[in-house]
């Protein structure tokens, strides 16, 4: 078995970027913050979004990818503890869903809250 040990989710649906934009806009004006962390992304849309990664896996001869959120999206320099924790949950939930949908192709690795001093326990759970 060939395992790619460093894969990031770089083909997220637009709803992820829209959520993050609203989340960051809420820093200046709370009215603009997202009302919910439910992005409304179906399982089918998630599976379709990773088709490029699956194609790269096949082309490179890899069987499995250790899969994590996009590193640049963590933005440790932006926001508050609450925003960091919420973004961490949203990002990790997407990775978990993809790995649940495609367990033969992906094993998830989560991110931790990127706000200084935010305890990892704030993300509320761990999936094994």
Model-identified regions with their sequence ranges:
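Helix-coil boundary/capping segments in enzymes
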Residues: 1-125
């Amino acid at each position: 078995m060939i395992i790619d040990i460093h894969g990031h989710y770089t083909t997220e649906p637009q709803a992820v970027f829209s959520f993050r934009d609203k989340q960051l806009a809420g820093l200046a004006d709370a009215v603009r913050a997202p009302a919910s962390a439910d992005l409304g992304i179906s399982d089918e849309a998630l599976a379709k979004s990773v088709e490029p990664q699956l194609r790269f896996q096949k082309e490179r001869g890899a069987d499995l990818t250790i899969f994590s959120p996009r590193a640049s999206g963590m933005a440790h320099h932006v926001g508050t503890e609450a925003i960091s924790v919420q973004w961490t949950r949203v990002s990790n939930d997407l990775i978990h869903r993809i790995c649940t949908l495609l367990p033969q192709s992906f094993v998830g690795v989560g991110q931790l809250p990127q706000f200084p001093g935010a305890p990892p326990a704030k993300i509320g759970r761990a999936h094994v």
